[in-house]
């Protein structure tokens, strides 16, 4: 993989890849893109519950939209749930409430039902059932897949497609999807490397002005980076951009990050060893956030000067053949804003070559 550009914002994840086949022969292989495990219980999903495909996955190869396959498997705290249980779902991305699960479970064969009962994959208990006429919920007994603690079922969804890589040529692959979020009721971050009571987090989430509320972690997502280890060698140029309405925190490369509107990473010859997590901080849900401008990944044709303003003070130098994120929608004249963490400013468009 020559280049990867990963752009994460509330409501959408976009990934662009540039692949190169350096051999003398075409290579045809299956490409797999797994999502982080999610609960099979309805209320663990985002608020896109009525969508046929909540994740809205789309795939393009060399600019043309392509078909793909969707598979899923079920686990209960790390142990596989028998594969026949997947018949309970009509399609991989379907989410079920407990009452529907109970009805679908009863439609299994007696032997299949007994296997799940004997294996303690399910239990008999009380569920909340919505009365659609009154709008009120009441308790009802039935077979449950999870009590949120001891018998939680997780669903692992994977998208796949067959890809041919021509010899000595490059191809671009792009896919987008709506990630699954956890909504945080306590306001404490889910990311494991962020300590909510630490001085660093308390200072970062403090009110910006007197009378304002402290920022709280509202929505949490995960992204699997380590699948890149399946490709030959490291990623030539890995580029990450996280955009949030106000601030975000999370874990990258096993360490914490604290970011304002943008968090940008550019790593040459990168082999990810840990996955990524993000908590978006705000005083309300961020799922409706829509950015005004689309970011672009550039390769520097330089060296190029980075200025505080167009024609302003020189802040530093962008080295030749390095990669940076920019926002051409906000350019002033021929000067494009650079969206790096501690190295932001303006660069002249003549020194920037668009990659994705």
Feature roles, as predicted:
Residues 1-293:
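Lumenal/extracellular ectodomains and adaptor appendage modules
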Residues 49-56, 299-302, 331-334:
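A short, compositionally biased
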Residues 355-356:
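Short, solvent-exposed mixed-charge patches
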Residues 162, 312-317:
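Short, surface-exposed secondary-structure edge patches
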Residues 60, 305-309:
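Core beta-strand residues in small-molecule sensory/regulatory alpha/beta domains
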Residues 157-158, 308-313:
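Short alpha-helix capping/helix-loop boundary micro-motifs
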Residues 317-351:
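SH3/SH3-like beta-barrel superfamily modules
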């Amino acid at each position: 993989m020559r280049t990867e550009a990963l752009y994460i914002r509330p409501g959408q994840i976009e990934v662009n890849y540039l692949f190169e086949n350096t051999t003398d022969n075409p290579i045809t292989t299956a490409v797999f893109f797994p999502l982080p495990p999610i609960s099979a219980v309805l209320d663990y999903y985002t608020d896109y519950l009525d969508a046929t495909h909540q994740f809205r996955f789309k795939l393009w190869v060399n600019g043309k939209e392509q078909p793909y396959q969707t598979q899923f498997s079920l686990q209960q705290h790390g142990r596989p749930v028998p594969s026949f249980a997947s018949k309970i779902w009509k399609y991989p991305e379907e989410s079920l409430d407990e009452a529907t699960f109970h009805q679908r479970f009863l439609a299994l064969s007696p032997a299949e039902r007994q296997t799940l009962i004997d294996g303690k994959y399910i239990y008999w208990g009380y569920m909340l059932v919505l009365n659609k006429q009154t709008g009120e919920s009441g308790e009802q007994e039935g077979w449950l897949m999870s009590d949120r603690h001891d018998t939680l079922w997780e669903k692992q969804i994977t998208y796949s497609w067959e890809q041919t890589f021509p010899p000595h040529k490059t191809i671009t692959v792009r896919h987008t999807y709506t990630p699954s979020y956890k909504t945080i009721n306590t306001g404490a971050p889910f990311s494991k490397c962020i300590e909510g009571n630490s001085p660093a987090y308390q200072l970062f989430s403090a009110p910006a002005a007197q009378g304002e509320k402290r920022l709280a972690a509202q929505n949490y997502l995960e992204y699997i980076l380590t699948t890149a280890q399946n490709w030959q060698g490291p990623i030539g140029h890995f580029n990450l951009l996280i955009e949030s309405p106000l601030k975000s925190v999370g874990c990258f490369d096993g360490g914490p990050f604290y970011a304002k509107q943008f968090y940008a990473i550019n790593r040459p010859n990168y082999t990810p060893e840990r996955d990524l997590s993000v908590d978006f901080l705000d005083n309300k849900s961020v799922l409706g956030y829509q950015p005004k401008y689309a970011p672009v990944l550039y390769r520097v044709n330089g060296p190029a000067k980075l200025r505080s303003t167009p024609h302003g003070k020189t802040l530093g130098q962008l080295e030749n053949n390095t990669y940076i994120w920019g926002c051409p929608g906000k350019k002033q004249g021929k000067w494009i804003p650079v969206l790096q963490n501690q190295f932001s400013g303006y660069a002249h468009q003549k020194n920037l070559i668009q990659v994705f």
